[in-house]
Amino acid sequence: MSENMNIKSKIITQFGVNSKDSGKSEVQIALLTNRINYLQNHFSLHKKDHCSRRGLLNMVSKRRKLLNYLKDENISRYINIINQLKLRR
């Protein structure tokens, strides 16, 4: 398995019910956060990569929508994921 798949499977098992549960909102938010953090490090080296920056903005927007959905559905799960990932509210 590649390093990326190992990281992804660890995130899924940490935030999901089992290793196959990738559809849960918390898992999707955690996976997006991991990719966003990776791209932020990428931009420190490649400042003029505007195509990837557009993808980053799309990921941030999708994560915000998932967080808003989770906040409306279950506030305790929302607070838990915010604290675990150390995100701002």
Swiss-Prot record:
Instruction: Name the chain's protein.
Output: Small ribosomal subunit protein uS15
A single GO molecular function term of this UniProt record: structural constituent of ribosome
Task: Provide the assembly information.
Answer: Part of the 30S ribosomal subunit. Forms a bridge to the 50S subunit in the 70S ribosome, contacting the 23S rRNA.
Extract the NCBIfam families matched here. Answer: S15_bact (TIGR00952)
Gene3D superfamilies recorded for this chain? Answer: 6.10.250.3130, S15/NS1, RNA-binding (1.10.287.10)
Family stated for the protein in its record: Belongs to the universal ribosomal protein uS15 family.
What PANTHER family does the entry give?
A: RIBOSOMAL PROTEIN S15, BACTERIAL AND ORGANELLAR, SMALL RIBOSOMAL SUBUNIT PROTEIN US15M
Q: Which gene encodes it?
A: rpsO
The UniProt entry, under InterPro entries, shows:
Ribosomal_uS15 (IPR000589), Ribosomal_uS15_bac-type (IPR005290), uS15_NS1_RNA-bd_sf (IPR009068)
Q: Which GO terms describe its biological process?
A: translation
Keywords assigned = Ribonucleoprotein, Ribosomal protein, RNA-binding, rRNA-binding
